[in-house]
Amino acid sequence: ISVILNLSKDHLDRYKNIKNYILAKKNILNNGGKNINLISIDDVYSNRIFLDKKIKNKISFSIKKITADICYNKDCIVDNYFHKNKKIKLLNISLDLNNSYNLQNILVSYIVCKYFKIPIKYFNESIKNFKGLPYRSLTIHNSKSKLIINNSKATNISSSLSTLENKKNIYLILGGI
């Protein structure tokens, strides 16, 4: 299974330019005869890879576009790949569903479970009990007037911004050099 969650110019430190970066990611795909390729269509570069007709055995997923094979919409996973418009309600999840990376990881986990015919109850149990990575969008304090989040795991602008999505009245403290 190959997965492309996102492509961002923040990742260009290892590549000469965006074209080389996209080519490197494409090389991950189609490495095996029965390989399945899970590709987010939420950013322009990943979407471009998904639309490439040379890429086979692909499933699109999205937290923004309901046209994807598997998408997130109104607290539900909407499955249009394995089923026709099946909705799976996400209940009792300890992860912050306002963060795009958590939602993307949940969608990918769902696709992998369906692909390997793992019963949905194990998927639900796993995401219900998953606590997330240390220091990644860790809620320190939550009250009516304040929400304090430690996201020191964020290593670039994109990962920092994903934590701030859907938040209001933000006071951002940054450190490091």
Where does each model-flagged region fall?
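Nucleotide phosphate-binding/pyrophosphate-handling subdomain across enzymes
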Residues: L90-I177
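Short secondary-structure boundary/capping segments
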Residues: I28-N30, F50, A68-D69, S137-I140, ...
